[in-house]
Structures are given as C-alpha cells and as structure tokens.
Amino acid sequence: MGPARRSAKLTRVTKGKNKVSGAAEAAYLADAALADNFDSLLAQAREAEQAFRHAQAVGAPADEQYPLAQRLSAALTAAMRAAYAAERAEIGPRGYEDRIYRRQAKARPAVHALTDEAERLLTLRETYQLTGFPARPKTQALGVQVARLPSH
C-alpha cells in the first residue's frame, strides 16, 4: 500500500502514537550522558579492583584493605549504573514510556550485549560485597565482636 492509499485516520494515529514526552526525552538525555562515561568508569573499576587484589595478595592489614574495598564497590556501582544507562539509551526515548517497545528493543543484539555487561558488573559487585570485602576497622575500636566465617 503506497502513501497515496493510506487512510488519513490511521496516519494520524500512527503519528501521534510515537511521540515522546519531555520527561522521557530528559531521562534519555541523562542516560546518554552517563553512558558516554561508561568506558572511563569501567577503567576506574578495573584499577580499583587491581589495587584491592594487590593489597589482598601482599596480605595488607584490614585497615589498608577496607578503603580500597570501598573504592572498588563505588567504582563497580558507578560502572554498573552507566551500563544500565547505556542499555536504556540504546533502546531510545520511546522505551521509557512504552513497555512493549522496550521489551521488543531488549531483544536486539546491541541492547542484549549491554544488558549482559550491566548484569555481569552487578554480579561482580554483589559477589565482592558478600564474600570479598574485609570488615570495617571501626568495629574493633567500638569493641563490637564481628562474626567471622572459618576459612577453608
């Protein structure tokens, strides 16, 4: 069906349906700006992880490891947020309001790759938080006993 044969009523419906609100456009622009920083945030997370792993490898005391662990957690969180923002930016502004459009867009390979990267960073952050970070040094100063799991 060519452009001359289209119904005027359907043309109006289609044009009006694809409009994006100002709030969705603003959220999209904010996510696009955050997504632009993803590579630098990921590099900061890698540097923080290397510093933390080095401190663990040399057997640094918990007082030295704890700030490095906090820095790693913050860097992983920032990189993860940027990855999810990149996913939303790849979907586009219409995805903020149209759940069907968003779901269809998530099936695209480019969006799927960004989702995988964001979830990988989320899993890495949670793994470190559950198993890899030392206890806060202030607990010793407060006289609070911290439960420790036996090491195998």
Regions inferred by a protein language model and the residue ranges of each:
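Short, charge-rich amphipathic alpha-helices with coiled-coil/heptad character
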Residues: 2-28
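Short, charge/polar-rich alpha-helical segments
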Residues: 20-42, 54, 58
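Charge-rich, solvent-exposed alpha-helical interaction surfaces
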Residues: 37, 44, 71, 117-120
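Non-transmembrane amphipathic alpha-helical segments
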Residues: 41-55, 75, 82
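Soluble, cytosolic/nucleoplasmic coiled-coil alpha-helices used as oligomeric scaffolds and tethers
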Residues: 58, 65, 78, 85, ...
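Short, charged, amphipathic alpha-helical segments
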Residues: 62-73
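Amphipathic alpha-helical coiled-coil segments
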Residues: 71-91, 113-117
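Amphipathic alpha-helical binding modules
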Residues: 93-152
